[in-house]
């Protein structure tokens, strides 16, 4: 394993652009999987409605029950809605950006905190500039990785507060506007929704949603998804990993992360077909089978830290540009 006290630097290009070209050369029919899935709006709206109903049912419940339902039900619903926001960020529901933004803002509502539009901005940068610390907000800040070290308690705290650190990272992306019309729209809809839940259902209903959100991306087996995607847990030379476990059924195949990075224009329902269409490329890669197992390994394994990531230098950037195909959309 690489050192747990510093990032691993690489002068090589990120693996996805080259693999995309290779797969298209060997299996050109994969292009047929590139499409939109407007039917995704159905589970999206159903999940939002479900969270509203559950919050109403819990509005007068004891805190222990609110915490229990948030951990066992709300976290899964909010995680699925985060995946819906992710789909919208790649314009995978509808052709126009406007409808995708509106869908993502709708999916954002049970999260309590407005993040859908800003996520779209920095997530696309992550795809284009993977491993570039100044442009990839998926990478921990240098101070963040140093402060939280390799012990159980600090890593548990990091997972618990993950949303705050994710927001903080976006400030280092200088070429993204912190505020624009769509971000303001996101805020207006979000805070109006929050106010309505508070006024008509009460503070416990809103807190149920907020707690569910923090569990969905943090101190919960679902939070292991952030470790699964790019942390050097299984191989110091493989920086992206897929997850093929059963929770993909509840998470709209978000575990198919290598497949998604290779072809971000393929919607969630067709990612398994992509894997089946290119077995020589994907079956040879290491992958995770359990988020729960990875969750505990991250917490207890001192060799897995926030430094377990690959950073790229300028030489890697030049090599990446050299292999890019202008006919392929990489975000």
Regions found by a protein language model. Give the residues of each.
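Transmembrane alpha-helical segments that form the membrane-embedded catalytic/substrate-channel core
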Residues: 73-85, 115-117, 163-167, 209-236, ...
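Short acidic-hydrophobic sequence patches enriched in Asp/Glu that either
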Residues: 95-102, 118, 215, 270
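Short, function-defining helix-loop hinge/capping sites that tune catalysis or transport
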Residues: 56, 94-95, 135, 238, ...
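Non-catalytic, topology-defining segments of multipass membrane proteins
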Residues: 1-74, 84, 109-209, 269-270, ...
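Membrane-cytosol interface motif
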Residues: 101-109, 238-251
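Histidine-centered catalytic micro-motifs
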Residues: 81-90, 119-131, 225-234, 250-266, ...
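Aspartate-rich (DDxxD/NDxxD/DxxxD) Mg2+/diphosphate-binding motifs
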Residues: 84-103, 135, 139-140
């Amino acid at each position: 394993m690489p050192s747990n006290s510093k990032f691993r630097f690489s002068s090589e290009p990120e693996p996805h652009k080259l693999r995309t070209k290779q797969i298209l050369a060997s299996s050109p029919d994969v292009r047929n999987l590139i499409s939109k899935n407007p039917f995704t709006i159905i589970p999206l709206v159903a999940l939002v409605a479900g969270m509203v109903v559950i919050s109403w049912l819990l509005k007068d419940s004891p805190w222990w029950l609110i915490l229990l339902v948030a951990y066992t039900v709300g976290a899964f619903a909010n995680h699925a809605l985060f995946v819906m926001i992710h789909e919208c960020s790649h314009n995978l529901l509808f052709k126009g950006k406007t409808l995708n933004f509106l869908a993502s803002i709708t999916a954002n509502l049970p999260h309590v905190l407005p993040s859908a539009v800003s996520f779209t901005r920095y997530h696309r940068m992550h795809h284009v500039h993977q491993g570039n610390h100044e442009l990839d907000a998926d990478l921990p800040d240098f101070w963040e990785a140093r402060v939280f070290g390799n012990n159980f308690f600090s890593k548990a705290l990091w997972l618990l507060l993950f949303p705050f650190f994710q927001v903080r990272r976006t400030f280092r992306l200088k070429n993204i506007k912190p505020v624009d019309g769509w971000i303001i729209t996101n805020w207006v809809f979000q805070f109006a929704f929050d106010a309505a839940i508070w006024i008509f259902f009460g503070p416990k209903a809103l807190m149920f949603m907020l707690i569910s959100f923090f569990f969905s991306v943090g101190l919960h087996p679902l939070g292991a998804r952030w470790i699964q995607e790019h942390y050097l847990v299984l191989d110091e030379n493989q920086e992206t990993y897929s997850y093929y476990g059963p929770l993909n059924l509840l998470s709209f195949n978000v575990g198919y992360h290598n497949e998604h990075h290779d072809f971000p224009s393929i919607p969630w329902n067709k990612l398994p077909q992509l894997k089946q269409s290119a077995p020589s490329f994907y079956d040879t890669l290491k992958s995770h089978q359990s988020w729960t197992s990875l969750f505990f390994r991250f917490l207890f394994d001192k060799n897995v830290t926030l430094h377990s990531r690959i950073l790229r230098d300028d030489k890697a950037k030049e090599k990446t540009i050299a292999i890019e195909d202008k006919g392929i959309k990489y975000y």
